Each structure stands twice: as C-alpha cells, then as structure tokens.
Amino acid sequence: MPTISQLVRKGRKTVASKSTAPALKECPQKRGVCTVVKTTTPKKPNSALRKIARVRLTNGYEVTAYIPGVGHNLQEHSVVLIRGGRVKDLPGVRYHIVRGALDSAGVANRMQGRSKYGAKKPKQKK
C-alpha cells in the first residue's frame, strides 16, 4: 500500500489489457487465404475430429481458424473471412471462419441459428 506522497511522486500505473485476437489488429474481421485445411483432435476429455484451417491474412499474419458447422467446401487457396473467438478445447485456435462469406459456403439444411452459419431462409411451401 503506497503512501500519499509516493502516489503524488509516481502515480498509479494503468495495466494495459491484452487482446484475445491480436492478428486482427483491432479490426472486426480480416480476409485471408487458406494454406492448409485439416482435422485435429480436441483436448481431454473431449473426442472428435474438429475441422480447422491455417489462414494467411492480408496483414501477413498466419493463424489457425476453426471451421464451424456441419460440412464445408474449403480447400487450399480458398479466400475466407476471419473473426475473433477461440475454441476452448483446441489449443492455439483463437479465430473462427465466417460461414457464407467470400469462398466459404453456408451450412446446408440449417434451420435454426441460420445467421451464425450463413444459411438462407428456406422457401415456404403453400
């Protein structure tokens, strides 16, 4: 606990908060090109084959991004849009690919939570 005179002399240091998505450089999204598209296994106690892509961004950064939803059409050289948001059970995956933007197609036959997966509203039958 500092004294009043110590505070007058030095003041208090403000602690700068670290960014959770540093490669975005304060932008909401960034464009990038897939260099590798593969599957990986999550940490214990979970078990699955999670789809991920290594993406080279327009600012030169290379990041690992998660491909959400069931099925995807991404391959090497696909142009994708990246947003922040980590995947808790995949170490080092701190970004998500935006479905339905650029080369990434929306999830087919998705009825609920469509806006998060780039799925169009289905046609109504009369």
Curated annotation (Swiss-Prot):
Disulfide bonds: none
Gene Ontology annotations for the cellular component aspect, listed alphabetically: small ribosomal subunit
One GO biological process term: translation
Keyword hit for Transferase: no
PANTHER family named in the record: 30S RIBOSOMAL PROTEIN S12 FAMILY MEMBER
Family: Belongs to the universal ribosomal protein uS12 family.
Oligomer status and interactors: Part of the 30S ribosomal subunit. Contacts proteins S8 and S17. May interact with IF1 in the 30S initiation complex.
Protein's name according to its UniProt entry: Small ribosomal subunit protein uS12
Annotated organism of origin: Clostridium perfringens (strain 13 / Type A)
